[in-house]
A protein has these predicted regions:
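N-terminal small-residue-enriched
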Residues: 1-472
C-alpha cells in the first residue's frame, strides 16, 4: 500500500476551501472455497486495492474512489469529491461532531497465520467435514460448505491530523445442510466467523456442530408436533436472543435510520424525533440491557477505531429497559448534539462509511440455563430459529423455531415443529423475566446500504425466558 500517495491526496484536498477531508485506503486479499456435495465447486483468490476521498465543503459532502494508484488519479479524486460536495450543499448544512486527531497503529494477531496454510490443506479440511456428513445414516443430500477469508490492511487519514493504520484477518464459514426423512426435507444454516487466524477454524469444531444440526432436523421430521396455539412461557436459546437483539434493538437504534436516511432503502425506525419512543423511553423490563461492543476480542465485528477514526467502545443501546444511546457517526452525532461513538464502517474503499452495528448482544443475568427451564411449568424452548422477519420500523416481528421442544414441569419433552412467535419490540423485551448468566455469540453478516454493504457482526446473548407470550 502506497501511504505516501494517500497522504498526497489529503495534502491536495487541504489546498481547497474545505471544512474537512479524509482519505481511506484498503488492501484486501480475498480467498473463498466452496464445497458442494463432496466436490470443490469454487475456488476464488483475489487482491483488491484502492482508496477513497471524502470532503465536506459548504455544508455538502462529496465522495470519490479509485483503484488507480497515481498522483494524477489522486488529484482527480479530490477534485471530483470537492465538486460533489459543492453541488450537494443545501440549506440544512451537513456538519461533523468535533474530534481530535489520532495517530496510531493496531492489528489483530494470528496464532496460526492464514497466509501459511496452503490452499490444498484448506480444501482437504473442508472435504473432511463434508465426508463426515455424507457418511452418516442420516440422509443429507444437500451439503454446501463455504469458507471466505479476508486479510485487510487499512490506512486512514484526515485533515484533523489523524493517521491510523490497521490489519485485520477475518475468517468465516457458511454451511447449508438439507436432511430428508421419508420424503420430507428440513434445512439448517450455520455461520461461523472470527477476527483471527486459522486457529479459529480448528476451534469451531464444525463437524460436530453440523452433525448435531442434522440429528435435530431428522428428529423434527420424525417426532415434531405442532404447537397448541395460545399464551405460554417461551424460553429462547442464545441464537434467538441474538437475532432479536440485532433486529429489534440494533437496527432501530441506528441514528441515520432514526433521522430518515435509510427510509428509501430499508425503512425507518419506530424511534424518531417527536415520536412516542426516544432516549429515556421504557422499551423493556428493567433487567434488559443490550449493548453493541466492537471491542470483544477476536469477534467477527471487532475493530479498535472505526472508519472515521473514532476509538471504539461499548455502546449501551437499551439500558435497564430504557432506550439509552443511539449508534452514531460524526454526521448524525452533530445533528443530534452529541459525539460519535465510533459506529461508522465501510466494507471496502469504494463504499462510504455508514452507521453500523458491530457485536450486538444482551448482557447476562443471574440464572443458569437449567434453572430457567426447571422454573417453567408449561412452555416452549425455542433453541434456534429457521426464519424471521420484521417490519420496516423494526417494531412488528416474527420468529420461527428450528430446534424447539415442549417444556413440561421443568423438563424438555418432545420436539416442536416450527413454533412461531409474532410480537412487537416492546412486548418482547417487556416480557423477559429471566436471563441466564452465560452469553454465547453467533457470527452473522449484516446487510445495509445502497450499494449493499455486508458487514461482519456478532449477534448473541444468554438464554432468556419470555413470560406468557402468544405462540402458535
Amino acid at each position: 500500500m502506497d501511504k505516501d500517495l494517500v497522504d498526497y491526496a489529503l495534502d491536495y484536498a487541504r489546498s481547497k476551501k474545505i471544512e474537512y477531508a479524509e482519505t481511506r485506503a484498503h488492501s484486501t486479499e480475498f480467498e473463498q472455497l466452496v464445497i458442494k456435495n463432496g466436490t470443490l465447486d469454487a475456488f476464488i483468490s483475489t487482491v483488491d486495492k484502492g482508496f477513497c476521498v471524502r470532503i465536506l465543503a459548504d455544508g455538502g459532502l462529496g465522495f470519490a474512489s479509485s483503484n488507480k494508484w497515481t498522483k494524477d488519479e489522486a488529484r482527480i479524486l479530490v477534485d471530483r469529491a470537492y465538486r460533489s460536495a459543492r453541488r450537494a450543499k443545501r440549506e440544512d448544512k451537513i456538519s461533523f461532531a468535533d474530534e481530535k486527531g489520532v495517530d496510531t497503529k493496531w492489528r489483530v494477531t494470528q496464532k496460526k497465520k492464514i497466509e501459511d496454510i496452503p490452499a490444498e490443506q484448506k480444501i482437504a479440511e473442508l472435504m473432511e467435514i463434508d465426508k463426515a456428513l455424507s457418511s452418516q445414516e442420516i440422509k443429507i443430500p444437500g451439503r454446501i460448505i463455504s469458507c471466505p477469508i479476508r486479510l485487510t490492511e487499512k490506512y486512514f487519514t484526515n485533515s484533523e491530523g489523524s493517521a491510523i493504520s490497521s490489519f485485520v484477518p477475518k475468517i468465516a464459514a457458511f454451511a447449508f445442510i438439507t436432511v430428508v426423512e421419508n420424503g420430507k426435507p428440513e434445512q439448517a444454516y450455520k455461520q461461523f466467523g472470527r477476527s483471527a487466524g486459522w486457529e479459529a477454524f480448528d476451534e469451531w469444531n464444525m463437524t460436530e456442530t453440523l452433525l448435531h444440526e442434522a440429528r435435530i432436523l431428522q428428529r423434527i421430521i420424525r417426532e415434531g408436533k405442532a404447537v397448541q396455539p395460545g399464551k405460554t412461557d417461551l424460553v429462547c436459546g442464545t441464537e434467538v436472543t441474538g437475532i432479536a437483539s440485532h433486529e429489534s434493538c440494533g437496527h432501530p437504534i441506528e441514528a441515520d435510520r432514526i433521522l430518515g436516511r435509510e427510509m428509501s432503502q430499508a425503512g425507518r425506525s419506530f424511534i424518531y424525533p417527536g415520536g412516542p419512543y426516544w432516549m429515556g423511553t421504557r422499551i423493556g423490563n428493567d433487567i434488559v440491557t443490550i449493548v453493541d461492543d466492537p471491542t470483544v476480542k477476536s469477534s467477527y465485528g471487532y475493530y479498535e477505531y472505526d472508519d472515521e477514526g473514532i476509538k471504539a467502545r461499548r455502546r449501551y443501546l437499551y439500558k435497564d429497559g430504557i432506550i439509552d444511546e443511539f449508534l452514531h457517526n460524526r454526521e448524525t452525532a452533530a445533528k443530534l448534539g452529541t459525539r460519535s461513538n465510533g459506529s461508522s464502517r465501510a466494507t471496502n474503499y469504494d463504499r462510504e462509511a455508514i452507521v453500523r452495528m458491530a457485536n450486538t448482544f444482551l448482557l447476562p443475568g443471574d440464572w443458569t440455563d437449567k434453572e430457567i427451564i426447571e422454573d417453567v411449568k408449561h412452555g416452549i424452548f425455542m433453541k434456534s430459529f429457521t426464519e424471521w422477519n420484521i417490519d420496516d420500523r423494526r417494531f412488528n416481528q416474527r420468529y420461527v423455531g428450528r430446534e424447539a421442544f415442549v417444556i413440561e414441569n421443568g423438563e424438555l419433552k418432545h420436539p416442536v415443529a416450527r413454533p412461531i412467535i409474532e410480537t412487537t419490540t416492546k412486548t418482547w423485551w417487556s416480557s423477559v423475566d429471566a436471563i441466564s448468566k452465560k452469553v454465547e455469540f453467533d457470527a452473522a453478516t449484516c446487510g445495509k446500504g445502497d450499494p449493499m454493504q455486508g458487514a461482519p457482526v456478532y449477534t448473541g446473548g444468554p438464554v432468556i425466558r419470555l413470560k406468557e407470550v402468544y405462540v402458535r
